[in-house]
Protein backbone atom coordinates (compact mmCIF):
# COMPACT_ATOMS: atom_id res chain seq x y z
CA UNK A 1 0.00 0.00 0.00
CA UNK A 2 1.20 3.49 -0.78
CA UNK A 3 2.01 5.98 1.92
CA UNK A 4 -0.34 8.84 2.81
CA UNK A 5 -0.93 11.41 0.03
CA UNK A 6 1.47 14.28 -0.37
CA UNK A 7 0.55 17.54 1.30
CA UNK A 8 -0.30 19.18 -2.01
CA UNK A 9 -2.55 16.34 -3.08
CA UNK A 10 -4.19 16.17 0.32
CA UNK A 11 -4.88 19.89 0.30
CA UNK A 12 -6.47 19.59 -3.12
CA UNK A 13 -8.72 16.80 -1.87
CA UNK A 14 -9.71 18.87 1.14
CA UNK A 15 -10.61 21.85 -1.01
CA UNK A 16 -12.81 19.75 -3.29
CA UNK A 17 -14.51 18.07 -0.35
CA UNK A 18 -15.17 21.44 1.30
CA UNK A 19 -16.96 22.72 -1.79
CA UNK A 20 -18.97 19.52 -2.20
CA UNK A 21 -19.98 19.33 1.45
CA UNK A 22 -21.66 22.70 1.90
CA UNK A 23 -25.15 21.86 0.66
CA UNK A 24 -25.20 18.41 2.29
CA UNK A 25 -24.04 19.83 5.60
CA UNK A 26 -26.73 22.50 5.65
CA UNK A 27 -29.49 20.01 4.98
CA UNK A 28 -28.26 17.63 7.66
CA UNK A 29 -27.97 20.40 10.24
CA UNK A 30 -31.54 21.48 9.77
CA UNK A 31 -33.21 18.05 9.84
CA UNK A 32 -31.02 15.79 11.98
CA UNK A 33 -32.40 13.84 14.94
CA UNK A 34 -31.16 15.06 18.29
CA UNK A 35 -30.60 13.15 21.53
CA UNK A 36 -31.98 14.74 24.72
CA UNK A 37 -30.00 17.75 25.92
CA UNK A 38 -28.05 17.44 29.14
CA UNK A 39 -29.24 19.92 31.80
CA UNK A 40 -27.40 23.22 31.45
CA UNK A 41 -26.61 22.89 27.74
CA UNK A 42 -28.35 24.78 24.94
CA UNK A 43 -27.87 25.52 21.26
CA UNK A 44 -27.71 29.28 21.78
CA UNK A 45 -25.60 29.40 24.94
CA UNK A 46 -23.29 32.13 23.59
CA UNK A 47 -25.99 34.12 21.82
CA UNK A 48 -25.33 37.19 23.97
CA UNK A 49 -21.83 36.69 25.37
CA UNK A 50 -20.12 35.67 22.11
CA UNK A 51 -22.58 35.57 19.19
CA UNK A 52 -19.86 34.92 16.59
CA UNK A 53 -18.32 31.99 18.49
CA UNK A 54 -19.39 29.27 16.06
CA UNK A 55 -18.45 31.22 12.95
CA UNK A 56 -15.01 32.01 14.43
CA UNK A 57 -14.33 28.33 15.10
CA UNK A 58 -15.66 27.31 11.68
CA UNK A 59 -13.49 29.82 9.83
CA UNK A 60 -10.37 28.75 11.72
CA UNK A 61 -10.93 25.04 11.08
CA UNK A 62 -11.65 25.55 7.39
CA UNK A 63 -8.44 27.52 6.89
CA UNK A 64 -6.34 25.15 9.00
CA UNK A 65 -7.55 21.98 7.27
CA UNK A 66 -6.89 23.51 3.87
CA UNK A 67 -3.26 23.82 4.96
CA UNK A 68 -3.07 20.43 6.72
CA UNK A 69 -5.72 17.92 5.72
CA UNK A 70 -4.67 15.56 8.52
CA UNK A 71 -5.68 18.08 11.17
CA UNK A 72 -9.36 17.19 10.66
CA UNK A 73 -8.83 13.67 11.98
CA UNK A 74 -6.62 15.03 14.75
CA UNK A 75 -9.30 17.40 16.05
CA UNK A 76 -12.05 14.80 15.83
CA UNK A 77 -9.94 12.26 17.70
CA UNK A 78 -9.09 14.81 20.39
CA UNK A 79 -12.80 15.33 21.12
CA UNK A 80 -13.38 11.56 21.29
CA UNK A 81 -10.45 10.97 23.63
CA UNK A 82 -11.62 13.80 25.88
CA UNK A 83 -15.20 12.54 26.19
CA UNK A 84 -14.40 8.87 26.72
CA UNK A 85 -12.28 9.62 29.78
CA UNK A 86 -13.89 11.55 32.66
CA UNK A 87 -16.46 13.10 30.32
CA UNK A 88 -16.37 16.03 27.87
CA UNK A 89 -14.51 18.44 30.15
CA UNK A 90 -11.31 19.28 28.20
CA UNK A 91 -9.26 17.33 30.76
CA UNK A 92 -7.23 15.81 27.91
CA UNK A 93 -5.82 19.29 27.22
CA UNK A 94 -4.34 19.72 30.70
CA UNK A 95 -0.59 19.38 31.07
CA UNK A 96 0.74 17.16 33.84
CA UNK A 97 1.54 18.66 37.23
CA UNK A 98 3.20 17.88 40.54
CA UNK A 99 0.30 15.53 41.26
CA UNK A 100 1.25 13.29 38.34
CA UNK A 101 1.26 12.97 34.55
CA UNK A 102 -1.65 14.35 32.57
CA UNK A 103 -3.91 12.33 30.29
CA UNK A 104 -1.66 13.22 27.35
CA UNK A 105 1.08 11.01 28.82
CA UNK A 106 -1.08 7.86 28.89
CA UNK A 107 -0.29 5.36 26.07
CA UNK A 108 -3.57 5.78 24.13
CA UNK A 109 -2.94 9.54 23.94
CA UNK A 110 0.76 9.61 23.09
CA UNK A 111 0.00 10.00 19.39
CA UNK A 112 -2.64 12.71 19.62
CA UNK A 113 -1.52 15.37 17.19
CA UNK A 114 0.44 18.27 18.71
CA UNK A 115 -1.03 20.45 15.97
CA UNK A 116 -4.53 19.62 17.21
CA UNK A 117 -3.68 20.83 20.73
CA UNK A 118 -2.12 23.96 19.23
CA UNK A 119 -5.21 24.56 17.09
CA UNK A 120 -7.52 24.42 20.12
CA UNK A 121 -5.37 26.98 21.94
CA UNK A 122 -5.25 29.19 18.84
CA UNK A 123 -9.03 29.08 18.51
CA UNK A 124 -9.49 29.77 22.21
CA UNK A 125 -7.16 32.76 21.97
CA UNK A 126 -9.06 34.13 18.97
CA UNK A 127 -12.36 33.77 20.81
CA UNK A 128 -10.87 35.55 23.83
CA UNK A 129 -9.94 38.51 21.65
CA UNK A 130 -13.18 38.62 19.66
CA UNK A 131 -15.49 38.14 22.63
CA UNK A 132 -13.77 40.52 25.01
CA UNK A 133 -12.52 37.97 27.52
CA UNK A 134 -12.58 34.32 28.47
CA UNK A 135 -16.16 33.41 27.67
CA UNK A 136 -16.09 30.17 25.65
CA UNK A 137 -14.90 27.02 27.43
CA UNK A 138 -12.13 24.82 26.07
CA UNK A 139 -14.51 21.85 26.12
CA UNK A 140 -16.97 23.72 23.88
CA UNK A 141 -14.12 24.65 21.54
CA UNK A 142 -13.25 20.95 21.28
CA UNK A 143 -16.83 20.00 20.41
CA UNK A 144 -17.20 22.76 17.81
CA UNK A 145 -13.81 22.09 16.21
CA UNK A 146 -14.65 18.39 15.92
CA UNK A 147 -17.97 19.16 14.21
CA UNK A 148 -16.34 21.58 11.77
CA UNK A 149 -13.59 19.06 11.00
CA UNK A 150 -16.25 16.56 9.98
CA UNK A 151 -18.01 19.12 7.80
CA UNK A 152 -14.87 20.40 6.08
CA UNK A 153 -14.01 16.78 5.23
CA UNK A 154 -17.36 16.23 3.52
CA UNK A 155 -19.36 14.82 6.43
CA UNK A 156 -22.64 15.89 8.01
CA UNK A 157 -23.17 19.06 9.95
CA UNK A 158 -25.05 18.91 13.23
CA UNK A 159 -26.05 21.30 15.96
CA UNK A 160 -23.67 21.28 18.91
CA UNK A 161 -25.17 21.80 22.38
CA UNK A 162 -23.03 24.35 24.23
CA UNK A 163 -22.44 25.41 27.80
CA UNK A 164 -19.87 22.84 28.92
CA UNK A 165 -17.39 23.93 31.56
CA UNK A 166 -13.80 22.77 31.97
CA UNK A 167 -12.45 20.38 34.56
CA UNK A 168 -9.81 21.62 37.00
CA UNK A 169 -8.21 18.17 37.12
CA UNK A 170 -7.22 15.36 34.79
CA UNK A 171 -7.90 11.64 34.98
CA UNK A 172 -5.43 9.06 36.25
CA UNK A 173 -3.37 7.02 33.81
CA UNK A 174 -5.39 3.93 34.73
CA UNK A 175 -8.67 5.71 34.02
CA UNK A 176 -7.38 6.69 30.58
CA UNK A 177 -6.40 3.09 29.83
CA UNK A 178 -9.80 1.86 31.04
CA UNK A 179 -11.73 4.40 28.99
CA UNK A 180 -9.88 4.03 25.69
CA UNK A 181 -9.79 0.41 24.48
CA UNK A 182 -6.91 -0.56 22.18
CA UNK A 183 -7.28 -1.18 18.42
CA UNK A 184 -6.82 -4.90 19.12
CA UNK A 185 -10.11 -5.01 21.05
CA UNK A 186 -13.07 -6.98 19.69
CA UNK A 187 -16.74 -6.00 19.85
CA UNK A 188 -17.58 -7.52 23.27
CA UNK A 189 -14.75 -5.59 24.92
CA UNK A 190 -15.70 -2.40 23.11
CA UNK A 191 -19.34 -2.65 24.15
CA UNK A 192 -18.32 -3.31 27.75
CA UNK A 193 -16.45 0.00 27.81
CA UNK A 194 -19.16 1.98 26.03
CA UNK A 195 -21.97 0.64 28.19
CA UNK A 196 -20.39 2.39 31.18
CA UNK A 197 -20.89 5.78 29.49
CA UNK A 198 -24.41 5.15 28.17
CA UNK A 199 -23.39 4.33 24.58
CA UNK A 200 -24.71 1.25 22.79
CA UNK A 201 -23.91 -0.96 19.79
CA UNK A 202 -25.41 1.51 17.32
CA UNK A 203 -23.28 4.30 18.77
CA UNK A 204 -20.20 2.07 18.57
CA UNK A 205 -20.66 1.33 14.87
CA UNK A 206 -21.53 4.93 13.98
CA UNK A 207 -18.72 6.53 15.98
CA UNK A 208 -16.20 4.03 14.59
CA UNK A 209 -17.02 5.63 11.24
CA UNK A 210 -14.73 8.44 12.36
CA UNK A 211 -12.01 6.15 11.01
CA UNK A 212 -13.06 7.23 7.53
CA UNK A 213 -10.32 9.87 7.93
CA UNK A 214 -6.91 9.64 9.54
CA UNK A 215 -3.90 7.34 9.69
CA UNK A 216 -2.97 4.17 11.54
CA UNK A 217 0.46 3.03 12.67
CA UNK A 218 1.84 -0.38 11.66
CA UNK A 219 2.29 -1.41 15.29
CA UNK A 220 -1.44 -1.00 15.87
CA UNK A 221 -2.41 -3.73 13.39
CA UNK A 222 0.73 -5.85 13.11
CA UNK A 223 -1.01 -8.56 15.15
CA UNK A 224 -3.19 -9.08 12.06
CA UNK A 225 -0.15 -9.63 9.83
CA UNK A 226 2.35 -11.61 11.90
CA UNK A 227 3.20 -14.41 12.16
CA UNK A 228 0.35 -15.20 9.74
CA UNK A 229 -2.36 -12.96 8.26
CA UNK A 230 -5.64 -12.71 10.15
CA UNK A 231 -8.15 -14.93 8.26
CA UNK A 232 -10.70 -12.09 8.39
CA UNK A 233 -8.29 -9.90 6.38
CA UNK A 234 -8.71 -9.73 2.60
CA UNK A 235 -5.68 -11.52 1.13
CA UNK A 236 -4.88 -8.81 -1.41
CA UNK A 237 -5.23 -6.11 1.23
CA UNK A 238 -3.04 -8.11 3.59
CA UNK A 239 -0.36 -8.23 0.92
CA UNK A 240 -0.53 -4.47 0.47
CA UNK A 241 -0.21 -3.94 4.21
CA UNK A 242 2.76 -6.30 4.38
CA UNK A 243 4.55 -4.16 1.80
CA UNK A 244 3.95 -1.08 3.96
CA UNK A 245 4.75 -2.93 7.18
CA UNK A 246 7.27 -5.66 6.21
CA UNK A 247 8.18 -6.60 9.78
CA UNK A 248 6.92 -6.22 13.33
CA UNK A 249 7.81 -2.86 14.81
CA UNK A 250 7.85 -1.04 11.46
CA UNK A 251 7.59 2.72 12.02
CA UNK A 252 5.21 3.60 9.18
CA UNK A 253 1.62 4.72 8.79
CA UNK A 254 -1.19 3.99 6.36
CA UNK A 255 -4.71 5.41 5.84
CA UNK A 256 -7.48 4.06 8.03
CA UNK A 257 -9.76 4.19 4.97
CA UNK A 258 -8.05 2.70 1.92
CA UNK A 259 -10.63 4.03 -0.54
CA UNK A 260 -11.10 7.71 0.34
CA UNK A 261 -8.59 8.51 3.12
CA UNK A 262 -9.30 12.24 3.37
CA UNK A 263 -13.06 12.25 2.78
CA UNK A 264 -15.63 11.79 5.52
CA UNK A 265 -17.98 9.31 3.84
CA UNK A 266 -19.33 5.77 4.23
CA UNK A 267 -16.45 4.03 2.45
CA UNK A 268 -15.10 2.90 5.84
CA UNK A 269 -18.05 0.49 6.01
CA UNK A 270 -17.56 -0.61 2.41
CA UNK A 271 -14.01 -1.49 3.46
CA UNK A 272 -15.30 -3.63 6.32
CA UNK A 273 -17.71 -5.53 4.05
CA UNK A 274 -14.76 -6.23 1.75
CA UNK A 275 -12.62 -7.34 4.75
CA UNK A 276 -10.38 -4.30 4.41
CA UNK A 277 -10.71 -2.89 7.91
CA UNK A 278 -7.34 -1.87 9.31
CA UNK A 279 -7.70 -2.69 13.01
CA UNK A 280 -9.24 -5.67 14.77
CA UNK A 281 -11.63 -3.19 16.38
CA UNK A 282 -12.73 -2.13 12.89
CA UNK A 283 -13.09 -5.49 11.15
CA UNK A 284 -14.78 -7.17 14.08
CA UNK A 285 -17.72 -4.82 13.64
CA UNK A 286 -18.49 -6.81 10.47
CA UNK A 287 -17.47 -10.20 11.86
CA UNK A 288 -19.61 -9.92 14.98
CA UNK A 289 -23.28 -10.83 14.57
CA UNK A 290 -24.41 -8.08 16.94
CA UNK A 291 -23.02 -5.26 14.79
CA UNK A 292 -22.82 -6.71 11.28
CA UNK A 293 -26.27 -5.55 10.14
CA UNK A 294 -25.41 -1.95 11.04
CA UNK A 295 -22.18 -2.14 9.04
CA UNK A 296 -24.17 -3.45 6.05
CA UNK A 297 -26.72 -0.67 6.47
CA UNK A 298 -24.14 2.11 6.55
CA UNK A 299 -22.19 0.58 3.65
CA UNK A 300 -25.35 0.74 1.54
CA UNK A 301 -26.51 4.19 2.65
CA UNK A 302 -24.28 7.16 3.38
CA UNK A 303 -27.38 9.10 4.40
CA UNK A 304 -28.14 6.56 7.13
CA UNK A 305 -24.55 6.71 8.35
CA UNK A 306 -24.50 10.50 8.42
CA UNK A 307 -27.80 10.64 10.30
CA UNK A 308 -26.66 8.16 12.95
CA UNK A 309 -23.16 9.60 13.27
CA UNK A 310 -24.60 13.07 13.91
CA UNK A 311 -26.94 11.65 16.56
CA UNK A 312 -24.26 9.54 18.25
CA UNK A 313 -21.54 12.19 18.30
CA UNK A 314 -23.90 14.72 19.90
CA UNK A 315 -24.88 12.05 22.43
CA UNK A 316 -21.20 11.34 23.09
CA UNK A 317 -20.49 15.05 23.40
CA UNK A 318 -22.75 15.25 26.46
CA UNK A 319 -21.06 12.53 28.53
CA UNK A 320 -20.64 13.70 32.15
CA UNK A 321 -20.56 17.36 31.16
CA UNK A 322 -19.88 20.05 33.76
CA UNK A 323 -22.36 22.94 33.62
CA UNK A 324 -23.61 25.88 35.66
CA UNK A 325 -21.17 26.56 38.48
CA UNK A 326 -19.31 23.26 38.11
CA UNK A 327 -15.70 23.32 36.97
CA UNK A 328 -14.30 26.49 35.41
CA UNK A 329 -13.79 28.34 32.13
CA UNK A 330 -10.05 28.05 31.63
CA UNK A 331 -8.07 31.07 30.52
CA UNK A 332 -5.46 28.66 29.15
CA UNK A 333 -6.67 25.32 27.86
CA UNK A 334 -3.46 23.60 28.97
CA UNK A 335 -3.63 24.59 32.65
CA UNK A 336 -6.20 25.00 35.38
CA UNK A 337 -6.94 28.57 36.38
CA UNK A 338 -4.81 30.17 39.09
CA UNK A 339 -6.48 32.47 41.62
CA UNK A 340 -6.54 36.02 40.32
CA UNK A 341 -5.12 35.09 36.90
CA UNK A 342 -6.94 36.29 33.79
CA UNK A 343 -4.69 34.87 31.08
CA UNK A 344 -1.94 32.29 31.30
CA UNK A 345 0.77 31.55 28.72
CA UNK A 346 0.19 28.45 26.65
CA UNK A 347 2.07 25.39 27.81
CA UNK A 348 1.39 22.74 25.18
CA UNK A 349 4.75 21.20 24.38
CA UNK A 350 5.89 21.40 20.78
CA UNK A 351 7.07 17.93 19.84
CA UNK A 352 7.64 16.06 16.62
CA UNK A 353 4.38 15.59 14.72
CA UNK A 354 3.18 12.03 15.22
CA UNK A 355 0.35 12.09 12.64
CA UNK A 356 -0.94 8.78 13.99
CA UNK A 357 -4.57 8.00 14.77
CA UNK A 358 -4.03 4.46 16.00
CA UNK A 359 -3.25 3.88 19.69
CA UNK A 360 -6.90 3.64 20.62
CA UNK A 361 -10.15 2.58 18.96
CA UNK A 362 -11.39 6.15 18.71
UniProtKB/Swiss-Prot annotation:
GO terms for cellular component: extracellular region; plant-type cell wall. The active site is at residue 81. Gene3D superfamilies: 1.10.520.10, Peroxidase, domain 2. Present in germinated and ungerminated grain, seedlings, and leaves and stem of the mature plant. Glycans are attached at residues 109, 234, 332. Keywords: Calcium, Disulfide bond, Glycoprotein, Heme, Hydrogen peroxide, Iron, Metal-binding, Oxidoreductase, Peroxidase, Secreted, Signal. Transmembrane segments: none annotated. Residues 1-31 form the signal peptide. This is Cationic peroxidase SPC4. It comes from Sorghum bicolor. The lineage of its organism: Eukaryota, Viridiplantae, Streptophyta, Embryophyta, Tracheophyta.
Amino acid sequence: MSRAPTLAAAAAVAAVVLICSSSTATAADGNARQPPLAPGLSFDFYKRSCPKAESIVRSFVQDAVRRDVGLAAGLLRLHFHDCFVQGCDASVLLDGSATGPGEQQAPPNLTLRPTAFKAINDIHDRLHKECGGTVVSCSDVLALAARDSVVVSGGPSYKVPLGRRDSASFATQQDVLSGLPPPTAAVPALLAVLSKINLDATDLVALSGGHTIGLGHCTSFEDRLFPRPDPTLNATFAGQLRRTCPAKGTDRRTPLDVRTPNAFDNKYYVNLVNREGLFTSDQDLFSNARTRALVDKFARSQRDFFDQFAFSVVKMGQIKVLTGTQGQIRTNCSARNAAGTTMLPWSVSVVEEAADESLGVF
